[in-house]
């Protein structure tokens, strides 16, 4: 029996491509009735209504409407929503163009230390009277000073500092009395506070302020157990501070000099950065008080002017702001609107990049792993040449720290180091060590439910960490990451912890969140309409009769839509999904060698005939017909019929001969996507293209083998397998990452290179994630509404 007669044949065949009837028209109606498991529409929002029920095959050229329905997609958007979207984009662009030394909230604590400085000209008055004015104008109703988020450590420290400053200059006794009442009512409650929320250097700063208050005859209740405990911590920490070392080389102690005694200012002044001590206004104000140094004065005058009398807890914070703002745009899925601004941001960061890393501000003499990790990750993602040497000073004995010499493990610092380590190139062993260390640490914190950070109070840090651990970089589909981060990102409500609580206005910003939600909703609408079209195509092609399930259909579309998610990439997205579906359908057929040969021969021969006579010859086999119609419609208007036919012929030959289908499928998908996107044909022979093609197809072959081994495992060890992939796969992905994220002379475009990573990532995702996890992701990405 020949293959042409062995498969079920429909009694009526659609004449148009994809098996659809001729003269298809479109009728839109909104519906959100989805299957709870897979999100499959019960009432499709996009109906394809036939005006001609059937007919003989008269050529693909008559099916333009069906082609536009499936392959061009739809991008409906309310004009008012579009106008709001444009407004938000312009607002964010203006924010980025105005970036300078950092938009950050004022710290009452630091402002009080600045206000304490006596006029260096000898008048006996305050050097910065506007700082006293700021303090006077910013007391809260309960008598305290501090951030709008109530954290007692922050309120006590800020309030005592402001009371000391006002009392020193004999100003506003009523405000001082009100502040002292707040302190008296709350200071004993410090014993009940979560120590993870304790500001930087609190155990040094609070006793110093209490001692200052006593000299001013301010009565502070200091006999409570909580205060005695803080004094004990102060004494213990001071004993551990290497005073000789801090005078010999820069350390993080430069950030918290205020109140410390026995300092050699002549030596410490050598460690200034643009006039400041680690960009700390309070530390620099303390230095100015003792030294009358002109550089300290210039730095503080600039800061006080910038913030209208107040000063932040750190300034500048330009590296911090530039990097974290870019990171937020990327993770929210809106970075494509700001490519120019992102390039400018990263050019700025790279200008101050060193092989020892960076700090939160430029030209600092101390570096930290958090900023260095974020900088390394983003710079490498955008093709900058960065060395792994930046991580050497943060590693000791197999462990990694936030700041050299301090073996502290702040969650966000370790989280960002973990994210950076996943961009390793081959043989970058220190990144492998960093990944193992941080993954283990974060996992332990997760299982003990102790993901609380010392640097930030954010909406859902446990969720961010969980996503990073559960969906590694190689498997993280762009729309999936954005969907999760939309729920994790707190916008304006996120607050950072320094010496006091503070806000980074261009990092944690509701404007980003508003745009991201509008953009996601628009993309999701487009995807749902396309999915409805896909279901109609599936039914009209009778693919279910060939054994293809609707779950497989949905998975194929989800993978494509989660990666090439932009509305304008509809052709690429649908070509990707449909190619995947047809590959799976053909592979699922149980055919003899002869039947495979007949299938391939019929495809090749009819493709040649149709290319010669305009597409008038109808195949005898229904599945061959669907395939030929599909290829023809994908190429329609692009003149790529022959190239697509050849790509399919190569895959079919591999299938016929029992060759490596994982590798062949990757090649087919890449050629299809590139032809659908209009990539110039000359790029296919580019040396870098060939390198990427080889590396991608190789790793996809390994991933498909691994996935098949998982599926066929009869010993119940799937749970173990899904947590780790083979060494060969990891090495292959590292090599691919190096090829994609390294810029060379006469390189391919970033978008073209990224497409290779997208295909490899989709294979990795399906091999790595369990089926039930993927099902939950499908519902979340495609069908759950954004609130």
Swiss-Prot record:
Subcellular location: Plastid, Chloroplast
Motif (DXDD motif): 368-371
UniProt-reported outcome of changing residue 402 to C: No switch of product outcome
Binding site for substrate: 237, 454
Transit peptide location: 1-47
Catalytic activity: (2E,6E,10E)-geranylgeranyl diphosphate = (-)-kolavenyl diphosphate
UniProt-reported outcome of changing residue 360 to S: Catalyzes the production of ent-8alpha/beta-labda-13-en-8-ol diphosphate and of ent-7,13E-copalyl diphosophate. Increased ability to produce ent-7,13E-copalyl diphosophate
UniProt-recorded Gene Ontology molecular function terms: isomerase activity; magnesium ion binding; terpene synthase activity
EC numbers for this chain: 5.5.1.28
pH dependence (UniProt free text): Optimum pH is 7.0.
Binding site for Mg(2+): 368, 370
Known cofactor(s): Mg(2+)
Family the UniProt entry places it in: Belongs to the terpene synthase family. Tpsc subfamily.
Notes concerning its domains: The Asp-Xaa-Asp-Asp (DXDD) motif is important for the catalytic activity through binding to Mg(2+).
Name the record gives this protein: (-)-kolavenyl diphosphate synthase, chloroplastic
